[in-house]
């Protein structure tokens, strides 16, 4: 997708050198937004291969409210291994905050709440889910990089709720390794929520705070920028699933994905 390559190019052209938590060093810009029209295909980067099983599986893991890598391992997904403790636990990360945000009266299921709000009060401006729980950050293996997202319902010409869009605010984006993953994950989430609320996916808006390229990814970025984006693939989800908790990997189908070869790079932990 050219819009993603434009972000990489902007970081190389305008970014500043900054030290970071991992000790690797980055080139970074602050404040960037990309808008993906989901009617034009699924926004999956084609200028390198993205392993979609990991993307789709991680999102379903979040939606399960899970914070242990056991389920991921059962599905041959190992993207969280570097942060898990000896028991496979990660602390109160995304799934916990999405499905079990602590409250004086118990816990709050933000995902169930937002799905119900979209169904019953589509014009609300409060269709928001947050993973940034300040009180629990110190207990998390990794504080949330993608921190808050909001849904927005658009009517058709007759005023009927028809289209669903999602905007993500991401405080920190590893633009070479992580951001393509995040784009695909939240585009998929938009498809899933649209499906169970009787809407159609319209747009995914990705707003980044610190968008950076690690210094040990620069060679891969230069190689990726030589590649011309190919057509977006098509995503379909099982329309028979009416509950956000009901989706399995087998309910998600991607067709027409024709990427360039992968560009391996080390992850900064």
Swiss-Prot record:
Keyword Methyltransferase attached: yes
| UniProt xrefs under PROSITE patterns | THYMIDYLATE_SYNTHASE
Q: Which transformation does this protein catalyse, written as a reaction?
A: dUMP + (6R)-5,10-methylene-5,6,7,8-tetrahydrofolate = 7,8-dihydrofolate + dTMP
EC number, UniProt record: 2.1.1.45
Report the InterPro entries cross-referenced here.
Thymidate_synth/dCMP_Mease (IPR045097), Thymidate_synth/dCMP_Mease_dom (IPR023451), Thymidate_synth/dCMP_Mease_sf (IPR036926), Thymidylate_synthase (IPR000398), Thymidylate_synthase_AS (IPR020940)
Q: Which positions does UniProt annotate for dUMP binding?
A: 21, 125-126, 171-174, 182, 212-214
> What are the protein's GO molecular function terms?
thymidylate synthase activity
Q: Where is the active site?
A: 145
Q: What cellular component GO annotations does this protein have? A: cytosol
Q: Name one GO biological process term.
A: dTTP biosynthetic process
Q: Which Pfam families match?
A: Thymidylat_synt
Note the CDD domains from the entry. TS_Pyrimidine_HMase
Family matches, as SUPFAM superfamilies: Thymidylate synthase/dCMP hydroxymethylase
Pathway per its UniProt entry is: Pyrimidine metabolism; dTTP biosynthesis
> Mind listing the UniProt keywords for this protein, alphabetically?
Cytoplasm, Methyltransferase, Nucleotide biosynthesis, Transferase
Chief location bin: cytoplasm
Compartments where found: Cytoplasm
Q: How does it assemble?
A: Homodimer.
Give the family this protein belongs to, as stated in its UniProt record: Belongs to the thymidylate synthase family. Bacterial-type ThyA subfamily.
Q: What does this protein do?
A: Catalyzes the reductive methylation of 2'-deoxyuridine-5'-monophosphate (dUMP) to 2'-deoxythymidine-5'-monophosphate (dTMP) while utilizing 5,10-methylenetetrahydrofolate (mTHF) as the methyl donor and reductant in the reaction, yielding dihydrofolate (DHF) as a by-product. This enzymatic reaction provides an intracellular de novo source of dTMP, an essential precursor for DNA biosynthesis.
Name of protein: Thymidylate synthase
